[in-house]
Each structure stands twice: as structure tokens, then as C-alpha cells.
Design a protein with these regions (language model features):
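Residues forming the flavin
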Residues: 1-52, 56-185, 189-526
């Protein structure tokens, strides 16, 4: 139990100790036996006044709740400890649980199961990170695309090649546990207190490796290059999963297959697993010089060694549709993220230092199921494929279509680059970046860029770059589950994470993975 002193606003260049001193001053708790620590810090660059905003935890040897009530200060509150209750069932599990997919959701599901003695079997269609790095690098240098091992598939999932953002809006108490587990396996210790924590692809990969080793150390098994090909269901209940040409008997399987496992979606649907279409988004990647974003958001303080590379979050709604920035990568690169042949797909990635020349983010436009309804659950998948194939046809290769913002706004193709150089690793073809998108998405992007330029000075500058398409922001389907977390149509299957339509980002996927593990643990003994 603790006292929380929130909203402590100080000049950005003061050390953390100044926030602790201010918390002590505000509460009058200056005695040496009062322990204090910063538990949250963020940067506020609004209105041209750059501040760090702190929350400080104070642990006192008396009734902290009564003290907070007596103070009657809105910025001082009592925070009881949140105890996570680990469930333990009594039924006997005949076969070890199976976890399909080793992205954030599957990784955390398997980790929790292994740490509590359930010896999970993990099936991952891609390779381990060592192999994956080699395969991805070879593709980016002009080699063949491996449709089972790429940016989307393999150990760590799509999140392993991202900015490693750990922000979420779900407010689940398990979020703290996720951060603690990541920090215990090599993530920077400060992720537990930053309001916008990130790890970076370089560090995150090592964290994933360490967690996988811990799974194996605790009795789990991980099989790479082993895609799920189907499930066996008897009387509405799971009895086996199919992989590697064999039936693997199991009563419980966590399906954390990722948002790009389109062939697996189709196979599971054919086995009777229920799917429904859901909203998602499509768009392009936008790149600016990071120094220009810093100047726009930090003003004269841009470049100060105590300020991180600036990041942003933009959104606009009009005519029942949204356009928003997504997965912003300060000092990052645009990456080739396709998982099917003869397609072009972009995504964003950055390293922990975020010290690249460009800033990039997706500019995504919302897509509603009514935009693509074809009478099946997979109309959104079909739309994604049409966009990705159209981009490939446009360039004639895995190179991505690219266009300056000024040319896009003026409705003309780009012939020559300006100050911003594209970072897409395979190379780009200058022309029209958004021509592969539906008309409504092109219109929304064209109308939103000037609006965003009024929010961040220079955002719609003529030399900024658009590279497309961005189609994998989230899953276009949901593997619908009931209150018991089982998938409709098959008791024993637990759809999980982004691919199931129940998460968006590393943190929420990891939390969903833990919840899936708890669902098994509350029913069965280890």
C-alpha cells in the first residue's frame, strides 16, 4: 500500500530527485523512514512549455489511507496493492496444453503456463529469431520471400520487428506484471515507470529469446517451423491440433496465431471455428526528418540531451470515418512486412536508441465491415490482398510505391525526391503511394494531412514522404469467444491476441496471453 502524489510538473532538465523532493514538500512527509520513488514520468510539450510530469510513490509506516483522506489534496491519493490471484484448478489434464504462435500473446501464455508447471507445447510456423533475422535480411537484400518466416511470422511475432512500444489503454492490473516480466528478462528497467515505455527491436529480440529459454527450462517445448494446419473437434470439443502431418492430442489450445495467418484462418473456419468480420484500417507510412518533428514539438529545446526524440499521436474524424497516426517510430525505418508472394506491405521499426534520421508513422484510415462485405467472414482479408497485390503490380516488384506529400495533395505523381529520403529497405518506385488504396481512404488521407499540419507545424510539408501500403494494423477478423474464453463452435480452443481480434499491440496481446493461461490454470491442476 502506498501514497501516490501525481501531477508533479517540473522543468524537463531537472533530475528525478527533484520530483521526489517536491512530493515530500507537498505532503510534509520528510522523515527518513518515508521511502519514496518515481513510479511514472512523461513529457508534456504542449503550449510550448516543455515539462516532465511525475507520479511519486511514498511508503509510510502508518495508516496511509487515513492520511490521504485527512490531507484532502486531489493530487494525493491512497493506492492499495493490487494482488494478482494465481488460479489453480483441480481437474486432471490428460495432455499438455498447446500454444500456437510465439508472438506476444503466445509467448506470455506459454511463459505463465511453464512457470506454473503445465509444460506447454508451443507450435510456431516461423523460425527462431536467429534464423528469422537471416531470412528477413536476405529478403530485404533482394532474396526470395519466405512465406512462413518473415516480419509477420516467427519467434516474437510482428512485434519483434517494431518500435517495441509498451503503451496501452486497457488499464488491466496485469500490465504491471507484463512490464516486470520484460524487465526481468533484459528490457530496460525504466519501462516500469515511463508513461510511454518502449524497448526497441534490438533489445526486444533478446528479451524474447530469454523468455523462450525460460519456457524450455521449466518443462515447456517449442517447435519452430511447425505451422498449425487444423484442429480435430469431437462433439463440439477440441481433441487434437494438427501440425507436421500428425494429430497432437490436447484438451486445451491457445490460438495466438497473429493477424496475418490468413491460411490458418481459412483452415480453422473449415474445421468449424467461428469467425466474424471486424473493423480494421489501411493507409500508408509517412516519413519526416526527425529533427523537423523535434523542432515542431520541442521548439527551441529541440536537440537537448535530456529530451528523447519527439513522438506524436494524431487523429481526425469526419463522415463517420477516422484517420489517425499509428505505430509512430521516432528515429526509425519503414520495413518490408509482406508475408505472401507478389505483394507489398509496409510497417515501421526502430531501435532502442531511436537515433535514425527519419521519423515514421502509419497514417491509417478506418475500414468498416460494410466497406467490404462479401457475405463471408473474410471480406477484409480479400480487401487487404487486393491492396497489397495492386501495390506489387504498380511497382512490378517488392519495391514500394512512394510519393511526396506535396505531390499527393496536388494529385500528381512524384518524379524527384526532396529533403526526406525513403528508408524502405528493398527500395521504392516514385509515383503514387496511395493509388492502391480504396477511393475513400485516399480522400480521407488527402483531407486529413492539412488538418494534421495545423496540429504539428510542417507535418504536411511538401517533401515529407508517403510509402504504401500499410494494411496490417490489426486483424480484419475476430475468432469470437464466449464468456468462458472458448471459441464459439469449439470448446477447448482459446482464441487469443491480435489475430483473434482481442488485442492491439504488444501490451494488450501479452495481457490477453496471460488471461488465456489463467483460463487453463483455473480449471486444471499442474
Amino acid at each position: 500500500m502506498s501514497l501516490m502524489v501525481t501531477g508533479i510538473r517540473l522543468p524537463f532538465d531537472l533530475p528525478e530527485q527533484a520530483a521526489i523532493a517536491e512530493a515530500r514538500r507537498l505532503t510534509g512527509l520528510t522523515a527518513n523512514d518515508i521511502q519514496a520513488a518515481v513510479c511514472r514520468v512523461s513529457i508534456d510539450a504542449r503550449r510550448g512549455q516543455i515539462s516532465r510530469v511525475y507520479s511519486v510513490r511514498l511508503d509510510a509506516p502508518f495508516d496511509e489511507k487515513a492520511f490521504a483522506e485527512k490531507l484532502q489534496m486531489p493530487f494525493v491519493r491512497y493506492k492499495p496493492n493490487t494482488k494478482i490471484i494465481i488460479p489453480h484448478g483441480e481437474k486432471r489434464l490428460e495432455h499438455r496444453p498447446v500454444v500456437v504462435g510465439l508472438g506476444p500473446a503466445g509467448l506470455f501464455a506459454a511463459y505463465v503456463l511453464a512457470k506454473h508447471g503445465y509444460r506447454p507445447l508451443v507450435l510456431e510456423r516461423g523460425g527462431d529469431l536467429d534464423e528469422r533475422d537471416k531470412v528477413v535480411d536476405a529478403f530485404w537484400k533482394g532474396g526470395a520471400l519466405d512465406t512462413d518466416c518473415n516480419i509477420q511470422f516467427g519467434e516474437g511475432g510482428a512485434g519483434a520487428y517494431s518500435d517495441g512500444k509498451l503503451t496501452t489503454r486497457i488499464g488491466d492490473p496485469l500490465c504491471d506484471n507484463v512490464l516486470e516480466i520484460l524487465a526481468a528478462h533484459g528490457a530496460p528497467a525504466d519501462i516500469v515507470k515511463k508513461a510511454k515505455p518502449h524497448v526497441g527491436t534490438d533489445i526486444l529480440k533478446n528479451v524474447v529469446r530469454e523468455m523462450r529459454r525460460e519456457i524450455i527450462k521449466n518443462g515447456g517445448e517449442v517447435r519452430f517451423r511447425t505451422p498449425l494446419t487444423g484442429v480435430s473437434v469431437k462433439n463440439g470439443a477440441l481433441c487434437a491440433v494438427q501440425a507436421d502431418g500428425q494429430d497432437i492430442a490436447c484438451e486445451r489450445a491457445v490460438l495466438a496465431i497473429g493477424h496475418s495467418a490468413r491460411d490458418t484462418f481459412a483452415a480453422l473456419h473449415g474445421n468449424g471455428v467461428y469467425f466474424e468480420p471486424k473493423a480494421f484500417s489501411v493507409g500508408v507510412r509517412i516519413e519526416h526528418l526527425q529533427t523537423e518533428i523535434d523542432r515542431a514539438l520541442y521548439g527551441k529545446a529541440a536537440g537537448h540531451p535530456m529530451l528523447p526524440p519527439a513522438e506524436y499521436n494524431l487523429s481526425r474524424r469526419a463522415d463517420g470515418r477516422a484517420c489517425y497516426s499509428f505505430c509512430m517510430c521516432p528515429g526509425g525505418v519503414v520495413v518490408a512486412a509482406q508475408s505472401e508472394e507478389n505483394t507489398v506491405v509496409t510497417n515501421g521499426m526502430s531501435y532502442h536508441a531511436r537515433d535514425g534520421k527519419n521519423a515514421n508513422a502509419a497514417l491509417a484510415v478506418s475500414v468498416d465491415p460494410k466497406d467490404y462485405d462479401d457475405g463471408t467472414p473474410f471480406g477484409g482479408v480479400a480487401l487487404q490482398r487486393r491492396i497489397e497485390h495492386a501495390a506489387y503490380t504498380q511497382t512490378g516488384s517488392y519495391r514500394a510505391p512512394c510519393q511526396k506529400v506535396g505531390d499527393f495533395l496536388n494529385g500528381k505523381p512524384t518524379r524527384k525526391l526532396g529533403a526526406v529520403k525513403p528508408s524502405y529497405p528493398i527500395g521504392v518506385e516514385l509515383g503514387e503511394a496511395a493509388a492502391c488504396l480504396p477511393d475513400f481512404a485516399q480522400t480521407m488521407l488527402r483531407d486529413s494531412l492539412p488538418y494534421f499540419g495545423r496540429k504539428i507545424r510542417g507535418y504536411d510539408t511538401a517533401d515529407a514522404l508517403l510509402t504504401g501500403p500499410e494494411t496490417r494494423t490489426s486483424s480484419p477478423v475476430r475468432m469470437t469467444r464466449g464468456e468462458d474464453l472458448f471459441g464459439l463452435g469449439c470448446s477447448g480452443i482459446i482464441p487469443c491476441g491480435e489475430g483473434a481480434g482481442y488485442a492491439g499491440g504488444i501490451m494488450s496481446a501479452a495481457v490477453d496471453g496471460i488471461r488465456a493461461a489463467f483460463r487453463i490454470m483455473e480449471e486444471f491442476a499442474d
